[in-house]
């Protein structure tokens, strides 16, 4: 096998490989000899089939197998010999000349192909012990826990039909028919819909206009859908709703005791408070970690500047761009609606993709040098969590993951990254700072502008007054 480097520019490489016909012929002869010992062909005794006959019957198929084996093995072995790591699977380039291919399969021509690839850049891990980050910490008050317990427990309250006008916290049962310009719109009608006034379940302005209604009332209300509403044909539009009030019910007094907790599947009120506190701690903890992680990544971003493999950047950009366009399409919005242009958005998101790839390579190198590993137990837990996301398709998803190494690698990557972050946190300066929950949950404007140069479109919701559109999540960089 003759190997010649034909391209070496930056991270780009191309090598030309020539496998002489005599080497192919030697491999074929070995395979034919092995096959002769096992071949059962009418008219010949076992092991006595002439090589020429076997070659006539199986020569081309055997040679095709040999060629494929060379292609499969060469990428790994040749890069190992060159002490290089390819950023992606090398591209195999072969002649498209059918006559030449036939000659190779007949053993009459050298097998020539090229491998085109990008190498991973060499990264020297720098001293990161001087990195300093601030970890925002929120003290969770008993009052906050109690408020959340009350909100959760309120779902267990029974309602009792009342006479008279509806007030906030009363439940109204209504039929409604939504109209745009006097014409009913898809998804804008419902019967026996139950709505607790003041819950914020419906769009702004809807519930407020039902305060004071009585059973039997018929009323037309006018509302304006939020500009970011998920259903594009309703976003920002004024609509009317014909309302028929069928019942007004008042909530029974909320009692917080062990019986209420048991209705929620928890053994006691004290345990409910504990569970709620743990949930709040977990929510705040996730926000805190993301903010700390961003500080670490920003510090690493300043310390590591190098060329990144363009194929990795292209793949990352395509993933981001696909999601952004999906979000915009679902919301029925354009880049102009988000006060930007497609060209500007592409430029910003490509920068984000390049940063992600570069920092991913840095974290990978830091983790490798530190001996960070993902255990089989951690990986199996991730597989289990992934399978659980598809009720009714568990077997199919599990089989897909079992047969698709790349899919499992995608599950492994975030686990590895978080373990590297843990390693960094244990070796850098971390200062805790007590903040309010409002300060903790306030959006980081710098992070938001980097993650989404265009305002992130809201996901699509049902074309009805129910639920305000959720804000999209920013991209982690």
UniProtKB/Swiss-Prot annotation:
Skewed-composition ranges (Basic residues): 454-466
Keyword Signal: no
Domain notes: Consists of 3 domains; the N-terminus binds the ribosome, the middle domain has PPIase activity, while the C-terminus has intrinsic chaperone activity on its own.
Record gene name: tig
Domain annotation PPIase FKBP-type: ranges: 169-254
Stretch list, region Disordered: 435-477
Organism: Brucella anthropi (strain ATCC 49188 / DSM 6882 / CCUG 24695 / JCM 21032 / LMG 3331 / NBRC 15819 / NCTC 12168 / Alc 37)
Subcellular location(s) of the protein: Cytoplasm
Name of the protein described by the UniProt record: Trigger factor
Assigned protein family: Belongs to the FKBP-type PPIase family. Tig subfamily.
């Amino acid at each position: 096998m003759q190997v010649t480097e034909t391209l070496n520019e930056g991270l780009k490489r191309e090598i030309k490989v020539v496998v002489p016909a005599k080497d192919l012929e030697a491999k074929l002869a070995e395979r034919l000899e092995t096959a002769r010992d096992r071949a059962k062909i009418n008219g010949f005794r076992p092991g006595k089939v002439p090589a020429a006959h076997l070659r006539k019957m199986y020569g081309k198929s055997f040679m095709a197998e040999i060629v494929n084996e060379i292609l499969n093995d060469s990428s790994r072995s040749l890069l190992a010999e060159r002490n290089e790591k390819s950023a992606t699977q090398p591209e195999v380039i072969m002649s498209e000349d059918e006559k030449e291919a036939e000659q190779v399969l007949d053993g009459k021509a050298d097998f020539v192909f090229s491998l085109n690839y990008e190498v991973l850049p060499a990264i020297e891990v720098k001293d990161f012990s001087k990195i300093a980050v601030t970890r925002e910490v929120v003290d969770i008050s008993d009052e906050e826990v109690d408020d959340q317990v009350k909100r959760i427990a309120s779902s267990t309250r029974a309602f009792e039909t009342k006479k008279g006008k509806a007030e906030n916290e009363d439940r109204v049962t209504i039929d409604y028919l939504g109209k745009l310009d006097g014409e009913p719109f898809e998804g804008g009608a419902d019967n026996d819909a139950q709505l607790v006034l003041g819950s914020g379940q419906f769009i702004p302005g809807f519930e407020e206009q039902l305060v004071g209604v009585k059973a039997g009332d018929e009323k037309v209300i006018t509302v304006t859908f939020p500009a970011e509403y998920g259903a594009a044909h309703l976003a920002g539009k004024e609509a009317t709703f014909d309302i028929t009030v069928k019942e007004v019910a008042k909530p029974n007094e909320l009692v917080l005791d062990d019986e209420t907790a048991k209705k929620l599947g928890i053994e006691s009120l004290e345990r409910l408070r504990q569970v709620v506190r743990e949930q709040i701690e977990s929510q705040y903890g996730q926000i805190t970690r993301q903010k700390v992680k961003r500080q670490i990544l920003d510090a690493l971003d300043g310390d590591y500047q190098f060329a990144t493999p363009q194929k990795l950047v292209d793949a990352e950009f395509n993933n981001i761009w696909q999601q952004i366009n999906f979000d915009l399409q679902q919301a029925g919005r354009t880049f102009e609606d988000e006060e930007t242009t497609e060209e500007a958005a592409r430029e910003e998101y490509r920068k984000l993709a390049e940063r992600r790839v570069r920092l991913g390579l840095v974290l990978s190198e830091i983790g490798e040098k530190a001996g960070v590993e993902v255990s089989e137990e951690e990986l199996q837990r991730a597989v289990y969590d992934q399978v659980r996301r598809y009720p009714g398709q568990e077997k199919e998803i599990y089989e897909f993951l079992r047969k698709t190494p790349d899919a499992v690698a995608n599950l492994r990557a975030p686990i590895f990254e978080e373990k590297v972050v843990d390693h960094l946190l244990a070796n850098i300066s971390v200062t805790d700072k007590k903040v309010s929950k409002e300060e903790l949950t306030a959006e980081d404007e710098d992070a938001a502008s980097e993650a989404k140069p265009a305002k992130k479109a809201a996901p699509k919701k049902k074309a009805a007054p129910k639920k305000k559109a959720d804000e999209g999540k920013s991209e982690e960089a």
